[in-house]
């Protein structure tokens, strides 16, 4: 098994066999990831084994209202919205869960966010976990909750 490093989703990647156990995450990868990438609305990165996707995450950009952010993030921003990178989706195939692939992809997303922040104004990485299980994973990884919404997490 030669698992790849995270790389940008390409036509060579095989998506049809991907199953993370969550139908909406499976469907988004299969039906929307390439379209979002070609339109520029999100960039998807995949981990694959012989081009068969076994994990993916998608990044996009957005903003959060100043009053919704922790003091550490809003300091010096006045009343302007806070620019963030959004970890829109992260999923690992059922057969590969529990091997650290999800943590590795999150680390890669954080690294990419840091690289982006060297070029443009970004204050944090924001996640929107899809369910309580994902939210619990985010809290275990030392991400910080968005004060106004319990299922949104910051990394800064």
Predicted regions and their residues:
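Short amphipathic alpha-helix that is part of the acyltransferase structural core
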Residues: 1-35, 39
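Short hydrophobic/aromatic beta-strand element in the GNAT-like acyltransferase core
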Residues: 42-46, 56, 84, 89, ...
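Conserved acyl-donor/pantetheine-binding loop and adjacent beta-alpha core of acyl/acetyltransferases
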Residues: 58-89, 97
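Conserved acetyl-CoA-binding loop-helix of GNAT-fold acetyltransferases
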Residues: 98-112
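Conserved beta-hairpin
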Residues: 40-61, 68
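Short glycine/proline-centered loop/turn elements that form peptide/ligand docking sites
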Residues: 106, 131-134, 150-156
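Residue-level recognition of the GNAT/N-acetyltransferase active site
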Residues: 88, 93, 130
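Conserved active-site alpha-helix within GNAT-family acetyltransferase domains
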Residues: 114, 120-122, 128-148
């Amino acid at each position: 098994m030669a698992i790849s490093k995270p790389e940008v989703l390409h036509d060579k990647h095989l998506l049809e066999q991907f199953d993370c156990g969550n139908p909406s995450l499976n469907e988004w990868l299969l039906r929307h990831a390439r379209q979002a990438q070609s339109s520029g609305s999100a960039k998807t990165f995949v981990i694959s084994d012989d081009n068969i996707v076994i994990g993916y995450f998608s990044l996009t950009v957005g903003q959060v209202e100043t009053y919704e952010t922790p003091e550490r993030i809003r300091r010096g921003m006045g009343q302007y919205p806070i620019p963030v990178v959004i970890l829109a989706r992260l999923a690992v195939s059922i057969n590969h869960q529990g091997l650290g692939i999800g943590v590795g992809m999150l680390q890669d997303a954080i690294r990419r966010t840091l690289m982006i922040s060297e070029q443009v104004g970004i204050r944090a990485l924001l996640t929107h976990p899809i369910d309580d299980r994902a939210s619990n994973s985010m809290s275990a990884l030392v991400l910080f909750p968005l004060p106004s919404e319990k299922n949104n997490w910051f990394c800064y």
